[in-house]
Every structure is written in structure tokens, then in C-alpha cells.
Amino acid sequence: MNIEQFQSMLEEKGITLSSRQLEQFKIYFETLVEWNEKMNLTAITEKEEVYLKHFFDSITAAFYYDFSKPFSICDVGAGAGFPSIPLKICFPHLKVTIVDSLQKRINFLNHLAQKLELSDVAFCHDRAETFGKKEGVRESYDIVMARAVARLSVLSELCLPLVKVGGTFIAMKGAAANEEIENGKYALEVLGGELKEMSTFQLPFEESERNILLIEKKRKTPKKYPRKPGTPNKLPIEK
């Protein structure tokens, strides 16, 4: 996906990028590749691949959810900033918090935010399991997002405790999401969530399947969740 295709395909979806926003994506790409030489941020470094598989793929969430309001967003395990930083570039009014367990990725994100001149962004070096217990952040976000971090039964325990009641958990998945949903339904129920919508589409050019799940937070999450670091992965909430 070259820059012209990136721009026009977003335009088709009603997302018009200014020259400043296009410049921010250019800086993002250059910074990602530069830092990737000294630490492992991504296996994808070829320009057209980054624009497709990182930038465009992250923004696809906005094809199925309206980001036009100044929502507070928490991105769990964002790594090099996906999906929340590409969304922040497109929708500058968003208030973004990224939680990542690796300090060197947080260092990269702090540097990136300076280079992109982003405001209303916060980067927290923490495990989602401990972050989700903290007063002031627990059940405080309009939207919590994660892209391909873990299977749904595990991911729900990391993300739903952070979503305010009435808010949305957006899980961005690859193929075979149906099986994940089936296995994850019980966890959603236990944690206070309900699957509202699942959208399946093909990522352009490479035609690989993507699924975006919109999960509404219906009830408060029981206090015992999230459990201790590592437990959700070892003992997922499944029947």
C-alpha cells in the first residue's frame, strides 16, 4: 500500500488526512524503522507493508466505530503504538493511554509522541493485570482497545475491568474469530461485557481476514478481576 492508496482508501471511508497528518505518518514510519534497528518493535519494516499492516490496519477500527467524540481510550499491550497512535493521528481530539509491560517500548512511545507533537497521550509501564486494579483508572475509560494481544477469554480479563459501564471494549482480531468468541462468551458474561457487533472484512491487497469485535460494558466487573499477573493466561475464564 503506497501513500496515495493509503490516503485515498481512508478518504473513501470518510477519513480525510491533512498534509500535517500525512507528515506525522511519515515521521512515525521513519522513527519506527530507526528504533527497530536497536530494539525489536516489529518484524514489518518495509514501507508499503507498514502503511498497510500497521497504519491502515489500526485505523480500520474507525470504519466500524465512530471516533468523532473526545473519547478517553486505553490501549492494552500496544507495542509500537498500534492501534491507538494511528487513530490518534487521524482523530487528534482522542485522549490516549497506552499500557505496556516493557519499559523500552514505553521509551520509544515517549520519543515518538514528542516527534509527532502529540498532546493528551500517556504511556504507562505496567502489566494490564495490575493497571486494571488501580483506583482512578479502573472502569474509567470510554473505550479500551487491543490488537491481536491474546485470545478473547484472556483479553477480556485484561481489558474489561478498565472500561466504564456503558463504554466499549474493541478487540481487533485476525481470522477464525468465531471460535474465540464461542470460547470467550463466558468470560464476557462474568466480567460484565456483551458482544454487540462483529465485523469481518479483508485487509486490502493481501486479502487476509480481519475481525473487529465491539463489546459493550453492561455491568461493573467483579472486584476479584483482573487476577494476578500471568493468571488470566494460565487459567482463562472458560467453562
Curated annotation (Swiss-Prot):
Keyword S-adenosyl-L-methionine: yes
Disulfide bonds: none
Pfam family, one: GidB
GO molecular function: rRNA (guanine-N7-)-methyltransferase activity
Positions contributing to S-adenosyl-L-methionine binding: 77, 82, 128-129, 147
One cellular component (GO) term of this entry: cytosol
Stated family: Belongs to the methyltransferase superfamily. RNA methyltransferase RsmG family.
Protein name: Ribosomal RNA small subunit methyltransferase G
Organism for this UniProt entry: Bacillus cereus (strain ATCC 14579 / DSM 31 / CCUG 7414 / JCM 2152 / NBRC 15305 / NCIMB 9373 / NCTC 2599 / NRRL B-3711)
